[in-house]
Amino acid sequence: MSKQDEVIVVGKFGASYGIRGWLKVVSFTDQPESIFDYKPLLIKVKDEWVEFSVESWKRHKGLVCKLEGLEVREEAQAYTNLEIAVKADALPELSEDEFYWRELFGMEVVTSQGYGLGIVDDIFETGSNDVLVVKANLKDAFGKKERLIPFIDEQVIKVIDREAQRIEVDWDPGF
């Protein structure tokens, strides 16, 4: 799938809000309200992504929005739990040393000495830095099934090679 065709889920609709067709919005973006900055927004209807327009949005114990064409609560209820997405090419371009998490999933992780630690399976945030969840190779010499590696640039993460789909780390394979 080319970047032009790829869609990225950036949120989802929650329950309807009020009687005039408004919906609660759960945003997955760093700044929750920035979900409304992306154009066009897409929703998945019957296994197909379709564009929609936000008529208005506001903060009210979170985010709520009104979609164009929805006038009553019953119409809005049909959108509950639908995912909100954008086309990947609508996301801002990053510099060479910046990455979207989605780019790191599936990359091979190796130590500076060439030992294969496994594949990036997940990433999560902590208070100080992000952490790579690396699913270990089946025949890992250290008997590890999973490793948690802090994403600390230059100190732990040495090189990220997009072309080779490889991350080089300064990490003890026994840990």
UniProtKB/Swiss-Prot annotation:
Q: Which SUPFAM superfamilies match?
A: PRC-barrel domain, Translation proteins
* Chaperone keyword on record: yes
Q: Which InterPro entries match?
A: PRC_barrel-like_sf, PRC_RimM, RimM, RimM_N, RimM_N_sf, Transl_B-barrel_sf
Pfam families membership: PRC_RimM (PF24986), RimM (PF01782)
Q: Which domain of life is it from?
A: Bacteria
What are the boundaries of the signal sequence?
none
> What Gene3D superfamilies does its record include?
PRC-barrel domain, RimM
Q: Which UniProt keywords apply?
A: Chaperone, Cytoplasm, Ribosome biogenesis, rRNA processing
Please give the GO cellular component terms listed in this UniProt entry: cytoplasm; ribosome
**Which molecular function GO terms apply here?**
ribosome binding
Q: Name one GO biological process term.
A: ribosomal small subunit biogenesis
Instruction: Show the coiled coil region(s).
Output: none
Domain named PRC barrel: residues:
95-175
For the keyword Cytoplasm, the answer is yes
Q: Where in the cell is it found?
A: Cytoplasm
Q: What is known of its domains?
A: The PRC barrel domain binds ribosomal protein uS19.
Summary of the function given for this chain in its UniProt record: An accessory protein needed during the final step in the assembly of 30S ribosomal subunit, possibly for assembly of the head region. Essential for efficient processing of 16S rRNA. May be needed both before and after RbfA during the maturation of 16S rRNA. It has affinity for free ribosomal 30S subunits but not for 70S ribosomes.
Family stated for the protein in its record: Belongs to the RimM family.
Instruction: Identify the NCBIfam families for this entry.
Output: 16S_RimM (TIGR02273)
Subunit composition and interactions: Binds ribosomal protein uS19.
- Which protein are we looking at? Ribosome maturation factor RimM
Give the taxonomic lineage as stored in the record. Bacteria, Pseudomonadati, Pseudomonadota, Gammaproteobacteria, Vibrionales
